[in-house]
């Protein structure tokens, strides 16, 4: 009976450990119907720029973020974003993006409830190659209208939106294919 009790406790402990330490929240995965329906486009047109972008699903059911960044009229950015309930993230310590890019540098951005800042982490793509981008939470830096600011550290449980941005004077056509975005 003692052996049976110990096995029971061991199983409960292992299950509990798995629940705590292997948190895996899929934030974006078109193959599981977590796709583009809640995404919106925000380009530099909000400031007089003329950059253009689009978001759609390709034949592989991956998200495509594509367009053209123009520096005319003091423009220079294109972005997609969507609302997200950070309560699902709880204690996530990193994000994993699986993307195929064009060699450009993109920003993965998060915003928190009650904060005017956005928290960004840059990632570089390799032209026409799939890459897994791992971004620890501590790598996110606070920005306000593209300028680095002093602000509280990112708290993932308060995240209320996420997005992808191309900026930093990377003029021309761009294309980013997103297979998934996950939090661990």
Predicted regions, residues:
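Bacterial Sec-dependent N-terminal signal peptides
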Residues: 1-25
């Amino acid at each position: 009976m003692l052996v049976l009790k110990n096995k029971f406790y061991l199983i409960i402990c292992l299950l509990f450990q798995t629940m705590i330490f292997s948190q895996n929240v899929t934030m974006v995965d078109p193959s599981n119907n977590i796709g583009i329906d809640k995404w919106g486009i925000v380009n530099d047109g909000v400031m007089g720029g003329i950059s253009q972008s689009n978001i759609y699903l390709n034949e592989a059911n991956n998200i495509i973020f594509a367009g053209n960044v123009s520096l005319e009229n003091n423009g220079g950015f294109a972005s997609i974003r969507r609302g997200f309930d950070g309560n699902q993230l709880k204690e996530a310590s990193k994000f994993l993006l699986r993307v195929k890019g064009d060699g450009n540098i993109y920003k993965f951005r998060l915003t928190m409830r009650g904060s005017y800042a956005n928290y960004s982490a840059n990632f570089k793509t390799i032209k026409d190659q799939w890459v897994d981008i791992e971004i620890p939470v501590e790598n996110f830096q606070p920005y306000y209208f593209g300028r680095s600011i002093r602000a509280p550290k990112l708290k993932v449980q308060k995240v209320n939106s996420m997005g992808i941005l191309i900026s930093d004077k990377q003029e021309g056509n761009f294309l980013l294919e997103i297979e998934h975005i996950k939090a661990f």
